[in-house]
């Protein structure tokens, strides 16, 4: 991680839910994604900000 990279604040997990399933999310620090196991989607985190758009989410294998 570079010095200028913004880190995701894990406290945000308490307030965020998956926009598709309305379930809680898990944080994948290595991939910088929020995972919705119910919806089978991974939402990217860019510059420390979760992108909670279904169209931007990656479908999990």
UniProtKB/Swiss-Prot annotation:
InterPro entries, per database record: Trm112-like
Annotated S-S bridges: none
Gene Ontology cellular component list: cytosol
HAMAP family named among the record's database cross-references: UPF0434
Entry's family note: Belongs to the UPF0434 family.
Entry protein name: UPF0434 protein RD1_0037
């Amino acid at each position: 991680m570079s010095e200028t990279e913004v880190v995701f604040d894990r406290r945000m997990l308490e307030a965020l839910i998956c926009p598709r399933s309305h379930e809680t999310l898990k944080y994948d620090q290595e991939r910088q994604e929020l995972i919705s196991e119910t919806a089978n989607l991974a939402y990217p985190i860019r510059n420390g900000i979760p992108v909670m758009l279904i169209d931007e989410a990656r479908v999990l294998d």
